[in-house]
Amino acid sequence: MSDRPSTPLLDNVQSPNDLKGLSDFDLKRLADELRAEMIWTVSKTGGHFGAGLGVVELTVALHSVFDTPRDKLVWDVSHQCYPHKILTGRRDQMLTIRQKDGLSGFTKRSESPFDPFGAAHSSTSISAALGFAVARDLGGDSDTGHGDAIAVIGDGAMSGGMAFEAMNNAGHLGKRLIVILNDNEMSIAPPTGALSSYLSRLYAGAPFQEFKAAAKGAVSLLPEPFQEGARRAKELLKSATVGGTLFEELGFSYVGPIDGHDMESLLSVLRTVKARADGPILIHAITKKGKGYSEHRADRGHATAKFNIATGEQVKAPSNAPSYTKVFAQSLIAEAEDDPKVVAVTAAMPDGTGLDLFAERFPSRCFDVGIAEQHGVTFAAGMAAGGLKPFAAIYSTFLQRGYDQVVHDVAIQRLPVRFAIDRAGLVGADGCTHAGSYDISYLANLPGFVVMAAADEAELRHMVRTALEIDDRPSAFRFPRGEGMGVDMPDRGTALEIGKGRMISEGNRVAILNFGTRLKEVQEAAETLSQRGITPTIADARFAKPLDEALILQLARHHEALITVEEGAVGGFGSHVAHLLAENAVFDTGIKYRSMVLPDIFIDQASPKDMYAVAGMNAEDIVAKVLTTLGVEVLSQRA
């Protein structure tokens, strides 16, 4: 590949141990090569981009100073782990990242000993690193010895309450723990010029306790008339290390802010911390997301498709239909135009959920609560109790983080919070950590909840309207990542009758009851089955709760077999259907019932179609399920 950058130093790095013999000057050169290598790699594969570019120098410095994997390096979220993977023996696999049978886009314990703790969701690193620190002190890791525990967490992730819960606990325990705050959005504070740089170097240049003692002792040595002024000056100096007061109150020593792209400063501070820290310490590093390529873009290259390095133009397949996310956003905007009580909540995902479009139109009615799903859910519940009509747009996988609030603050009080659950089902390149596999199960078991799933983008538009009109209890509607089916779209949604499904086509012998966007696969399966002389009845449930009991019982009593299909785990729609059939003694009549759900495994990253193939839920799998259920020989199987 002739466009690959020249990387003579990086070419000799097989593991972090190879960094130990490099001079500080060569470590800086290595960082430059590593950044060029990452830009080239992601231009070929796509992936999370900006975060990794922002921590190149930090990654090199950490692996140079510390002894990984003996020292446990825990990356929060781990969007920024690409440089780390390149330095830890996975460079030759980077072109497989986020692809089937390739490297994960996140840290993953089963992938490398240099990934001591997996991640993908936010704000977990300090808790995990503290766990490693306690295990170290109690002799829990006899295989790799007792090393340092280092958490690298971004300023965005610090908006998650779990991070502060961990810091509070760490400060109480007093264990030697290193937290690096990677501040790449200037949301806490930028460095404050030469004074800040001097204070950071001074703090790193002497033992921490000596530094603090000197600061306290110096005041008492002054003549009495000058002591009050000196105390004020000391407080001013303390405030110059912006953010330090908060972290010190939590029990952490504080260093910073420092320039996270200045290799000399990073190495100096990290070496001093390694040599002298005797309790929890936080290093505040200021970095630029997208450093070296995309730092001037509005999103700083958070995630990207394959792209042309010279022009930045992304290589994307042409769109055949609007995305489900965009349909949701446009539908909600249309409803909000007519109803001033409609408000929207997102947990740090305005672009991903489409609420950036809503915010442009209704800035005072859209609330980004940060990475705080627990707060976001209860905040929405409070607005509902106050007479507003909140839509909480949250990915299925992230709604898990606010489940107690869904139960305690929303469901028990029957508050009409409307949950727009994006990324339902299997999501592709982000793999199992972002799959929306469980929301049907964990919502449909709650009394009073209305749970819907859109079979296509037109149905989604109707479900937005339906949720708006449900004003006496909570509701949820789920939809997948990606583009819709290309169906004709109504200008506005029409409220659906609660708990009523729809017949798609009538046949005989077997009925297939769909819930969600597998409907297209069901219809393709029916076409194949028709060539075998089998014409299934197809119905779309629309609702997992309340069930359309009349429709389900009719299908069961007039067919030899009933098969449900859903993009969720066991315990969801199919389980509720089975319970209904059992309670109505339908199984006593000999009905053959099968439920097609996601298997009891975590499915690694691949294309959604490949992931559903692993799950056994594509059209050919539905065909095979129908034939085996009816006792008809399956003529061929996939290799």
Swiss-Prot record:
Magnesium listed as a keyword: yes
Cofactor(s) named in the record: Mg(2+); thiamine diphosphate
Keyword flag ATP-binding: no
The reaction(s) this protein catalyses: D-glyceraldehyde 3-phosphate + pyruvate + H(+) = 1-deoxy-D-xylulose 5-phosphate + CO2
Cofactor note (record): Binds 1 Mg(2+) ion per subunit. Binds 1 thiamine pyrophosphate per subunit.
HAMAP family: DXP_synth (MF_00315)
Complexes and interactors: Homodimer.
Name of protein: 1-deoxy-D-xylulose-5-phosphate synthase 1
Organism from which the protein derives: Jannaschia sp. (strain CCS1)
